[in-house]
Structure formats: C-alpha cells, structure tokens
C-alpha cells in the first residue's frame, strides 16, 4: 500500500465506491462478510490518511483538523444494552478516531477525529448495526430450536444484547488481524502507520484537552 503513489481524490473515490457497493447493506449476508467489508473500508481509510499526511497540500492539511460530534448510543431501544457504544468504540479505535461516553451513560456518545474519519466511522456504524441486528433476529430463531433454549429459555432482547456484544468483539479481532497483516507485509509501511497513529492520537488528545 504505497500512499505516495496515490492521489487523494483517487483514494477518496475508491472509498466512496466501496461504500456505495455496500449501501443498503442487504448484500452483506453474514457476520464474516460484514467484518470483511469493515476491513476493506479500514484499508482505504488508512491509505487516505497516509496520503494526506505525506502528499496533501498545506491547504488540505489545514482543513484536515480534529472535530467532535455527539451521537446517539441508544438507537435500537427495543434491544438496549451497551453494544452500540462497544461497536462505535471498536470502529473508532481502528479508524483514527476516539469515542467516549458523555457523563456516565452509554446512551450519549462523543466522537473525536478528523472529518473524513468521523464520517466513515458513522457510516460503518450505521451499516454494521443494521446488519448485525438483522443477523441477531435470525440467530435467535435458530437458537429457539436448540435444547439449550428448551432447558433455559431467555428473552429475545437479552439474547440479542449478548450476540451483538459478540459481534463487536469479533469485529475488533478482525480489524486487528487485518491491521497486523498489512503491517507485516512491509516494514516501511508499518513504520509509517505507527507514526501516523501516534501523531493522530496526539492531535485528538490535544483537541480534547
């Protein structure tokens, strides 16, 4: 992944094209496909950030500053639980943003990061949440046919909360695996990404403080 050979507009076009491919999310039919889609977006967003860092003009870099945005962490009210916060936290973690609870509740969240990164994280969160919730309903139907359910039945929302927390954990593992694999391919790329993450974290931390 050579960022210096990529035009910023070209990278953004690829990112938009991939988002459009997954728009509507119905083409994603399994947890594995959902995680793979998120990993593909992650690769392009990393490429975009490296390109901006290395070949972006002074004007582009001046506009590429840290922002903050409040988001709802309780959009699926019939399910409840902290899974939406956990999902957003994972996406921020691997896409150059930070996510915090506002006060003591997971229902109100704040994202910090550069504009393109925040927009991508929000898009991923919406797409993945919709798919994971749809999967959870199907998995619950299957679970109700098992001996485990017959012996100790649980409500659908309780099952979904557990399942969706598992989806967030699985996504975290997939994105870490993808990041490690990309870094292992090229020592120079690994060094650039590590340095970029450090600088980005410092910029976000400075903004928050």
What are these regions (language model features)?
Residues 2-13, 50-209:
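Extended, helix-rich structural scaffolds rather than catalytic motifs
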């Amino acid at each position: 992944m050579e960022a210096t050979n990529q035009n910023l507009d070209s990278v953004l076009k690829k990112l938009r094209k991939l988002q459009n491919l997954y728009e509507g999310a119905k083409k994603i039919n399994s947890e594995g496909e959902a995680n793979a889609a998120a990993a593909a977006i992650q690769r392009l967003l990393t490429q975009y950030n490296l390109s901006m860092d290395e070949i972006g003009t002074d004007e582009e870099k001046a506009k590429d500053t840290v922002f903050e945005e409040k988001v709802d962490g309780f959009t699926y009210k019939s399910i409840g639980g902290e899974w939406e916060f956990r999902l957003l936290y994972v996406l921020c973690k691997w896409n150059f943003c930070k996510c915090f609870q506002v006060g003591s509740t997971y229902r109100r969240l704040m994202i910090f990061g550069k504009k393109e990164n925040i927009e991508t994280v929000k898009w991923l969160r919406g797409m993945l949440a919709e798919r994971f919730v749809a999967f959870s309903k199907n998995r619950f139907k299957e679970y109700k046919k098992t001996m485990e359910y017959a012996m100790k039945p649980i409500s659908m929302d309780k099952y979904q909360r557990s399942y969706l927390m598992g989806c967030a954990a699985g996504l975290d593992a997939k994105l870490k695996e993808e990041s490690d694999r990309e870094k292992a391919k090229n020592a120079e790329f690994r060094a650039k990404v590590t340095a970029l993450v450090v600088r980005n974290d410092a910029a976000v931390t400075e903004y928050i403080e």
